[in-house]
């Protein structure tokens, strides 16, 4: 993760997964999640991943802030296996308010969770 102070944490629950054929005999999974992120209230989103032990992914979400505002978020990142049915993820994301963050987290398939932290870029 880029140098800087931790801006916040997130805790997401995976709510569903949709599998579709991908390029070159790959399989894509759309992972839907919901939860909370520090300073961004309730978050609902979807990441699209090429199924495997490592690879790229992209995502988009909507953040429903406590003050009633809505902020959107898009990201691109990579993942790699970090244990049995666990994956470590790193991404760079852009909020519609102009803020850019570096994100690190871990997905746990058994628990159906994605938890991590983010740091705002200066």
Regions found by a protein language model. Name each.
Residues 1-122:
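Beta-strand-enriched cores of mature, soluble protein domains
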């Amino acid at each position: 993760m880029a140098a800087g102070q931790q801006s916040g944490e997130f805790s997401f629950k995976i709510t569903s997964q949709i599998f579709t054929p991908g390029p070159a005999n790959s399989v894509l999974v759309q992972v839907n999640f919901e939860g909370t992120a520090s300073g961004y209230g309730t978050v609902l989103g979807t990441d699209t991943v090429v199924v495997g032990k490592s690879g790229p992914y992209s995502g988009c979400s909507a953040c429903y802030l406590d003050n009633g505002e809505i902020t959107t978020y898009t990201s691109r990142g990579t993942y790699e296996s970090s244990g049995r049915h666990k994956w470590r993820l790193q991404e760079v994301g852009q909020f519609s308010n102009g803020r850019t963050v570096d994100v690190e987290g871990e997905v746990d398939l058994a628990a159906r969770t994605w938890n991590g932290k983010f740091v705002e870029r200066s």
